[in-house]
Amino acid sequence: GFSSLFKAGAKYLLKSVGKAGAQQLACKAANNCA
């Protein structure tokens, strides 16, 4: 389902842009940046 797809995407982001980049993207995606 969507959850497993999201987890796979998160792992891909972590590998490709690094932890900080992935967190920033997730923050923007959630529109919840401090």
Curated annotation (Swiss-Prot):
Q: Does the keyword Transferase apply?
A: no
- The parts of the chain that form a coiled coil are none
Question: What are the cysteine partners in each disulfide bond?
Answer: C27-C33
Which organs or tissues contain this protein? Expressed by the skin glands.
Highest taxon, organism lineage: Eukaryota
| Biological-process GO terms, alphabetical | defense response to bacterium
Main location (coarse class) = secreted
Return the GO cellular component terms, semicolon-separated: extracellular region
Q: Which keywords belong to this entry?
A: Amphibian defense peptide, Antibiotic, Antimicrobial, Disulfide bond, Secreted
Q: Where in the cell is it found?
A: Secreted
Query: Does Lipoprotein show up as a keyword for this record?
Result: no
The record lists the membrane-crossing segments as none
**Which family does the entry's similarity section mention?**
Belongs to the frog skin active peptide (FSAP) family. Brevinin subfamily.
Function recorded in the entry: Antimicrobial peptide. Active against the Gram-positive bacteria S.aureus FDA209P (MIC=14.9 ug/ml) and B.subtilis ATCC 6633 (MIC>64 ug/ml), but not active against the Gram-negative bacterium E.coli or the fungus C.albicans.
Q: What is the name of the protein in this document?
A: Brevinin-2GHa
